């Protein structure tokens, strides 16, 4: 059976851990030529990829320069996966101006930067798939203490639909993936933060996370990566502008 992403050139941001790394690994296993980036390039060590590079997606100059480098060396991307993100915990009362600005810059504007930088070359060949990581906590569902995070992830869905509409007749598709609670280093840090804030043990906090899941378990990054591989592939050629849940029934 042929590999579904054979020879496709794919860029994955925040590929050093969690969902981003799982996507980069799955893409490589499906035959893609993966360009893996992360702000901490040490996290990219051991990752099978065509190119590994430190990239600050909050810097327009860095993203533009990197896009020019890739276009010159390798040509237009076939797939762009935007994974970089940050989870702020708290309500509107806990959200400072800095928290708001940082969250929107990393969770939303970073996607604007990469899409704006890489889409022109995709347009040149009238083909490309963009996959943006949003969340079930967004315009789909409100969750306590995810005020600015939910707002940013709702914005990601809106951004994705806008890009899909703009380029729907030019060969470029854009879709959003909306994970529920996924086992990852990011979740581990949130559990630690919650434990410190509440005085509860790590086991108690983790148990509470699991008990909130309709399926009675947390999701796995590989389950998100499987959907990303499908959306990036030609098998999904008639799918664009959608928010796809991988949430174990969280949004039911």
Regions found by a protein language model. Name each.
Residues 91-92, 96-104, 209:
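Substrate-binding pocket helix/loop in short-chain dehydrogenase/reductase
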Residues 115, 152, 160:
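Active-site helix of classical SDR
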Residues 135:
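Residue(s) in the substrate-gating loop at a strand-loop-helix junction
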Residues 168, 173, 239-241:
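Short, small/polar-rich loop/turn modules that mediate ligand/substrate recognition or access, typified
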């Amino acid at each position: 059976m042929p590999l579904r992403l054979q020879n496709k050139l794919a860029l994955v941001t925040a590929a050093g851990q969690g969902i981003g790394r799982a996507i980069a690994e799955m893409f490589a296993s499906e035959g893609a030529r993966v360009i893996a980036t992360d702000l901490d390039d040490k996290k990219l060590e051991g990752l099978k990829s065509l190119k590994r590079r430190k990239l600050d997606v909050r810097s327009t100059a860095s993203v533009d320069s990197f896009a020019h480098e890739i276009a010159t060396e390798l040509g237009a991307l076939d797939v762009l996966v935007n994974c970089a993100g940050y989870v702020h915990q708290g309500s509107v009362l806990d959200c400072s101006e800095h928290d708001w600005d940082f969250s929107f810059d990393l969770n939303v504007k970073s996607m604007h930067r990469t899409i704006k930088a890489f889409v022109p070359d995709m347009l040149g060949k009238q083909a490309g798939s963009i996959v943006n990581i949003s969340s079930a906590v967004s315009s789909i569902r409100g969750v306590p203490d995810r005020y600015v995070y939910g707002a940013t992830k709702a914005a990601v869905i809106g951004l994705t639909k806008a890009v899909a509409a703009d380029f729907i007749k030019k060969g470029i598709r854009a879709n959003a993936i909306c994970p529920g609670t996924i086992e990852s280093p990011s979740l581990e840090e949130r559990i630690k933060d919650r434990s410190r804030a509440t005085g509860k043990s790590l086991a108690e906090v983790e148990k509470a996370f699991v008990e909130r899941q309709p399926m009675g378990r947390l999701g796995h990054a590989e389950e998100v990566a499987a959907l990303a591989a499908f959306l990036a592939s030609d098998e999904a050629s008639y799918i664009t502008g959608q928010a796809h849940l991988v949430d174990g029934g969280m949004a039911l």
